[in-house]
Amino acid sequence: MRKIGIFGGTFDPPHNGHLLMANEVLYKLDLDEIWFMPNQIPPHKQKNSFSLSMHRVEMLKLAISGKEQFKLETIELEREGPSYTFDTVRLLKDRYPDHEFYFIIGADMVEYLPKWSNIDKLVNMIQFVGVKRPGFQIETPYPLVFVDVPIFEVSSSLLRDRIKNRQPTDYLIPDEVKVYVKENRLYET
């Protein structure tokens, strides 16, 4: 049975905080791989608020290249409509019956779990992994495994603003992603 961490998000753009979080979960939970899974239309975000899927996929490929245990999973981009975790997990379990899935969420998403579609069924299908900051307490009635990750204060929205305002992004995003963003003139307006 392969142990696979699923890391969903818009990754618009992917940054070093994403990579740090994935790497910490990979090693602390002794997983075989982390699959980065870009969302089609996350239910909690506006439809036109992020870059084209092809750009996000290409940036993710660049960000995770060279890390053998990091993979790209595009199952949510293959479907139409909103990306609900329950539907995605059902598809993944059908496609990969010999895999055990660990769904990685940030501390900020833990409080929203009661609002997730089919959450009571979902917690029986996968293991949720809550990524938290050292010393940050999270209360939830759901069975979560918590992983402490070093503090790295960066977000994709911060990076989009910095790029738009021509501020430096050094050490915040992988160099290959930075080049891709510049060559494709992403986030300039």
Swiss-Prot record:
Q: Which SUPFAM superfamilies match?
A: Nucleotidylyl transferase
What is the top EC class of this enzyme, as a single word? transferase
| Family the entry assigns | Belongs to the NadD family.
Pfam (any one): CTP_transf_like
Database matches in PANTHER family:
NICOTINATE-NUCLEOTIDE ADENYLYLTRANSFERASE-RELATED, PHOSPHOPANTETHEINE ADENYLYLTRANSFERASE
Database matches in InterPro entries? Cyt_trans-like (IPR004821), NadD/NMNAT (IPR005248), Rossmann-like_a/b/a_fold (IPR014729)
Record's function text: Catalyzes the reversible adenylation of nicotinate mononucleotide (NaMN) to nicotinic acid adenine dinucleotide (NaAD).
Q: What is this protein called?
A: Probable nicotinate-nucleotide adenylyltransferase
The organism encoding this protein is Bacillus licheniformis (strain ATCC 14580 / DSM 13 / JCM 2505 / CCUG 7422 / NBRC 12200 / NCIMB 9375 / NCTC 10341 / NRRL NRS-1264 / Gibson 46)
Reactions that this protein is recorded to catalyse:
nicotinate beta-D-ribonucleotide + ATP + H(+) = deamido-NAD(+) + diphosphate
UniProt-listed Enzyme Commission number(s): 2.7.7.18
Q: Which GO terms describe its molecular function?
A: ATP binding; nicotinate-nucleotide adenylyltransferase activity
Source gene?
nadD
Which cysteines share a disulfide bond? none
The record's keywords, sorted A to Z, are: ATP-binding, NAD, Nucleotide-binding, Nucleotidyltransferase, Pyridine nucleotide biosynthesis, Transferase
What pathway is this protein a component of? Cofactor biosynthesis; NAD(+) biosynthesis; deamido-NAD(+) from nicotinate D-ribonucleotide: step 1/1
Give an example GO biological process. NAD biosynthetic process
Is NAD there in the keyword field? Answer: yes
